[in-house]
Amino acid sequence: MASGVGAAFEELPHDGTCDECEPDEAPGAEEVCRECGFCYCRRHAEAHRQKFLSHHLAEYVHGAQAWTPPADGEGAGKEEAEVKVEQEREIESEAGEESESEEESESEEESETEEESEDESDEESEEDSEEEMEDEQESEAEEDNQEEGESEAEGETEAESEFDPEIEMEAERVAKRKCPDHGLDLSTYCQEDRQLICVLCPVIGAHQGHQLSTLDEAFEELRSKDSGGLKAAMIELVERLKFKSSDPKVTRDQMKMFIQQEFKKVQKVIADEEQKALHLVDIQEAMATAHVTEILADIQSHMDRLMTQMAQAKEQLDTSNESAEPKAEGDEEGPSGASEEEDT
């Protein structure tokens, strides 16, 4: 192994082994550095070449001079330069490692941030899709409910129009205001049958020869009749019940039968009063209908007179216009003829 580098030492012959390996286990040298003069095996030569890029290694030849020691100043300066270069490389390598580690950490943080943003966007998209689905379901449910409500409303209106009791009653009232035999308005009252009839019933109908009256006369007559029959019947019923209940000979069954008979009499009086009231209502409705019919007839007659007067006025206006046209033509020809005579 070589030793002594510098002016104080003489160059010793190399022993032909690697100066980097352990002396006891050092293999044979294969390359030698021309700058530092050390001999290396294949492995250490490659490491020395990568560590000191400015050094030049050559094949080791046993017995040849491996290295010429430079001057003291030159060697020291070269060694200092090599050390400085090595330190700079180490600093650069450390800075590169730090920058790489920082870049890796930044890239990891960016990737984590991107993953978090992707997760958040996925969650937001899922929430949005769920909200859209819920909105669609709600809108569909509202549309279905609206359609059902419309169909129900239509069904109700149809049902009301078909089964509305007020409409049916109005139709019945309108039908009652017409004569069932002749289809005319009920404008006369038959005293014998106590019935409303039309004007044709006493002429060609079933009421020929009967005593008749107007609707106003029949209404006043029915309304002026004494309506105390119901009150008198109730008073008589109370008196008879008192007398019957005070008789000790009357059994319980006889008392029940008596009460039923008396109440049937009262019910008949009530039914007669009901028919009388309904009859008055019918006569009043017939009077109103006849009155409206008279008013409509008067309006129609007035309209007919107005239309006739308008037609006559238009005819007179047309006649006056026709008579005025020839006169205007003659006036125009007169001055022209006079001017022609003057010219001649």
Curated annotation (Swiss-Prot):
Gene Ontology MF term list: zinc ion binding
Zinc finger (B box-type): 174-215
Residue spans crossing the bilayer: none
Cross-referenced PROSITE patterns: ZF_BBOX
Region (Disordered): 1-25, 68-165, 309-344
Coiled-coil spans in chain: 290-325
Composition skew (Acidic residues), residue ranges: 93-165, 330-344
UniProt KW keywords: Coiled coil, Metal-binding, Phosphoprotein, Zinc, Zinc-finger
Residue positions where Phosphoserine is found in the record: 336, 339
Biological process (GO), any one: positive regulation of defense response to virus by host
Family annotation (Pfam families): zf-B_box
Stretches with biased composition (Basic and acidic residues): 75-92
Residues that coordinate or bind Zn(2+): 179, 182, 201, 207
PANTHER family according to UniProt: E3 UBIQUITIN-PROTEIN LIGASE TRIM (PTHR24103)
Quaternary state and interactors: Interacts (via coiled coil) with TRIM17 (via coiled coil).
Summary of the function given for this chain in its UniProt record: May play a role in the process of differentiation and maturation of neuronal cells. May regulate the activity of TRIM17. Is a negative regulator of PAX6 expression.
The protein's name in its UniProt record: Tripartite motif-containing protein 44
The organism of origin for this protein: Pongo abelii (Sumatran orangutan)
Upper lineage: Eukaryota, Metazoa, Chordata, Craniata, Vertebrata
